[in-house]
Amino acid sequence: MSRQLSRTDNLIHQFDTILRTLVPHAATASRANPAAGTQDKAMSDAERRHAAGLMRINHTGEVCAQALYQGQGLTAKLHETRDQMEQAAAEEIDHLAWCDERLRELDSRTSYLNPAFYAASFGMGALAGKLGDNISLGFVAATEEQVGRHLDDHMHKLPMGDRRSRAVLEQMRTDEAHHERWALEAGGARFPAPLKLGMRLMSKVMTKSVYTL
């Protein structure tokens, strides 16, 4: 059972999470990098730039996921599922660190737009939390489903020689599927198709802009 945190403890924790999420190279993974021991094959400069664009999108997706969990943490009750929510958020920090590390290996960087997407996702998470735990958990499930779609698409689009990025994305895909399943089993509402379509359209704005910026 988690220790009950004071208001000051919560503020410190929130600020620390913001820093680890938005400051480049600040996130530290609690698990080993899935790409450890995996070697890339030869890639052209164009392939490396393409791989970096995809990994930048994935990194920003994890920034959004972390903001979602943090926003919900401020407003949702989640008495029965807070431990699982905190575990999922910790795994998203792992994903942030792995994507950041891979971007550096590809001689690239994280997106300049991360603060804006963080703020938007934080607000949506806080609003979802206010609407009740079933909506909050349903939003987690729908978001993780969307992230999973991106990961599947990116694993298909990665250059054949980029084995290290693929290893990272495969582990992330496993984690995201687990988060989605947990949120639904915990009572999350299944969002209707029109709402999911709206989320996909918003996601396209992110992917188009972050690929280069």
Curated annotation (Swiss-Prot):
- Cite the binding residues for Fe cation 2: 92, 144, 176, 179
Main enzyme class: oxidoreductase
- Main subcellular localisation: membrane
Keyword Oxidoreductase among record annotations:
yes
Q: In which pathway does it act?
A: Cofactor biosynthesis; ubiquinone biosynthesis
Q: Which CDD domains match?
A: DMQH
Q: What is its EC number?
A: 1.14.99.60
Q: Which UniProt keywords apply?
A: Cell membrane, Iron, Membrane, Metal-binding, Monooxygenase, Oxidoreductase, Ubiquinone biosynthesis
Concerning PANTHER family, the annotation shows:
5-DEMETHOXYUBIQUINONE HYDROXYLASE, MITOCHONDRIAL, COENZYME Q10 BIOSYNTHESIS PROTEIN 7
Q: Which family does it belong to?
A: Belongs to the COQ7 family.
Q: What is this protein called?
A: 3-demethoxyubiquinol 3-hydroxylase
